[in-house]
Amino acid sequence: MLLGRGLNGNAERQGRAVMSRHWLTRRLQSWGDRPALIWSNESWSFRQLCDGRDAWLRHLAQHGVKPGDTLAICGDYSPKLCALLLAALVNRNIIVPLASATAPRWNRLMELAQVQFAVRFEGDDSWHVSGFDRAVSHALLRGLKERDAPGLVLFSSGSTGESKASVLDFDRLLAKFEVPRPAYRMLVFLLLDHIGGINTLFYGLCHGGTIVTTRERTPDAVCAAIEARRIELLPTTPTFLRILLIADAIRRYDLSSLKIVTYGTEPMPPSTLAVVREALPRVRFKQTYGLSELGILPTQSRDSGSVWLKLGNAGFEHKIVDGVLWIRSPSVMLGYLNAPSPFDADGWFNTQDLVEREGEYIRIVGRKSELINVGGEKVHPTEIENVLLQVDNVKDVTVRGQPNPVTGEVVAAKITPLGPEDPDTLKRRVRQFCHARLERYKIPAVIEVVLEDHYGARFKKSRDQTSIRPPADTDAGS
């Protein structure tokens, strides 16, 4: 329902007081008439964005949204939505961003986050406010309210079950941006409810850059935006970079303005990195590392063509225990709303990411939960995928373990061909290719040829638990 309470003068004055002492507010105001956001061919300056934030502070007071209330912000990166995000931060709300792509799940996610108010944005940037008769009972949310601190609730993709809800202190998450950094014209690619999307938005705004949005995240739409808006920095995923290569979009557009491509959310296949570097030889490629629970950590790639990276130590510590990366930092999440605490007694967070170390550099292998146990031999899907992606006429591949009564598990691969080919012929070629490059137990025993995509709205490879269908004549080693 739409709420319409009278303006609360005390709340407005209190909001202005907090706003005046917040470093981010002063920073944004200092950029004045610089372009802050380009959306649907419309440019908003930092001055307009700040004016929009102030208008939202009045709207929040009128609708009875008090500091500490949980507020869902539903939509994409429109000017009014971004202004509301800034206002909610100043108002010390617990913010629950929900991207349009997840709309079918909004009600369930709002229930998990104990949302009390929601603002839903339409495609034309119009909006409406709803209120819910819902008490906030979770200790983490109540703790933020008691500390008068703004919060952020982010959900995992939920590809292997119900989404986990991470609760973060928004001020702590943004503290790293107080140190001035270079400004870029950036395309915001990752979704509003993704830690990478939040990081891109606030990096750009905090350093006087320009955030450019695109209504579609297709190869042509993204490359057209880079060409038209002279984008300098593209944050994306390895999966989308491979899609760009397959679509041949890089060749069809002028991408000469592009200086940096950052990639994360999943391990980068070295074969994909090599090809995309060849296609964009003047671009610097940088691997990022982050999780909803951690934020995005400072990293340094060994070089533009390497999947090895060095984790910075500004504001956090890391260690490797039994091949798994652990992180400790003041900005790490406070905990989950709907899962046990992943912290040990000393405050270390178990990322569940397997890594290899080489001096001061590490390589992200993948999730520990995705390891395949073939008769006691450990196989990680990313190793096999990197080999299979080099086979002619393979567009995409997903590898995972499949139960087997003899070996416990076998390697199973789901392959999408680039062009028409007899499935049996493709399977034979794949196995022949693997025989020269992989140990016998790593060669896929089960191969399914499919036509659908292997990724979801976040352009990250989806590894659901659905078994790959074995053919009747499966031979687990041939």
Range-by-range predicted roles:
Residues R58-A101, L191, K378, P417:
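Conserved AMP-binding/adenylate-forming
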Residues L438, P444, V450-S478:
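Flexible lysine-rich "adenylation lid" loop at the C-terminal edge of ANL adenylation domains
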Residues S45-R47, G143, D148-E178:
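Conserved AMP-binding A3 loop
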Residues T25, D33-G64, A72, N107, ...:
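Conserved AMP-binding/adenylate-forming core of the ANL superfamily
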Residues L233, A247-G305:
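Gly/Ser/Thr-rich phosphate-binding loop
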Residues I73, L234, S329, Q352-K442, ...:
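AMP-binding/adenylate-forming catalytic core of the ANL superfamily
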Residues K319-D346, E377-V379:
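Conserved ATP/PPi-binding loop(s) of AMP-dependent carboxylate-activating enzymes
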Residues L174-R185, D193-L233:
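Conserved AMP-binding/adenylation subdomain of ANL enzymes
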